[in-house]
A protein has these predicted regions:
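ATP-dependent adenylation/nucleotidyltransferase module used to activate substrates
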Residues: 1-156, 181
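Histidine- and/or cysteine-centered catalytic micro-motif in compact active-site loops
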Residues: 147-149, 169-172
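A mobile, often basic/glycine-rich helix-loop segment
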Residues: 155-171
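Metal-dependent de-N-acetylase/amidase catalytic core
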Residues: 173-180
């Protein structure tokens, strides 16, 4: 059995914070970090690290329910706790319109959203489009919040959660993200 890697949380937090600072110095000294906030561990820890590195005024949390969102209140609370500006964009009308447009292309009573691969991955891709639209508007950089464990097992949809201008947690497995948080 492989030996469990022990991390020094303080060293890792300093390392990540310095990496974020350097990234923004080189790639957008006046830019904001645009991050999707789900209320989960990854977006919460990433947002906290961004605040530490850039200051809360340069971090924008975007909450994107698809109609309903089980962790909506938690996501709002995360933004409030960190003191970051938050924007809520309900993507339900976008996903519904996309499904309708695709279904209209078929001659039969097709229902594309009944395909689990579509109904799971499409909202993630739409969320990433929303983040990039907001980043363009605010001269921001989009944050990828995936961790190493998700990348390893292929949990994240291509052009969805995996997209971003930079990744804060990609070197850390779930256990390490929890320790850092």
């Amino acid at each position: 059995m492989a030996k469990r890697k022990i991390i020094d949380v303080n060293i890792e937090v300093d390392h990540i914070t310095n990496w974020i600072k350097n990234y923004f110095i080189k790639n957008g000294p006046n830019s904001k970090a645009i991050i999707g906030i789900s209320g989960g561990k990854d977006s919460t820890v990433a947002a906290a690290l961004l605040c530490r590195a850039l200051g809360k005024d340069r971090v924008v949390g975007v909450i994107m329910p698809d109609g309903t969102m089980s962790d909506f209140t938690i996501a709002k609370d995360v933004c409030g706790y960190l003191g970051i500006n938050s924007i809520v964009v309900d993507i339900n009308s976008i996903t519904s319109a996309l499904y309708r447009a695709i279904d209209d292309g078929y001659d039969d009573d097709h229902c594309i959203k009944n395909n689990p691969a579509v109904s799971t991955n499409t909202p993630a891709r739409i969320r990433m489009s929303v983040l990039y639209a907001l980043a363009a508007e605010m001269h921001g950089r989009v944050v990828n919040t995936c961790n190493k464990s998700e990348d390893y097992v292929g949990y994240s949809p291509k052009y969805g959660d995996l997209a971003g201008d930079f990744s804060v947690l990609s070197s850390y497995c779930v256990r390490e993200v929890k320790e850092i948080g």
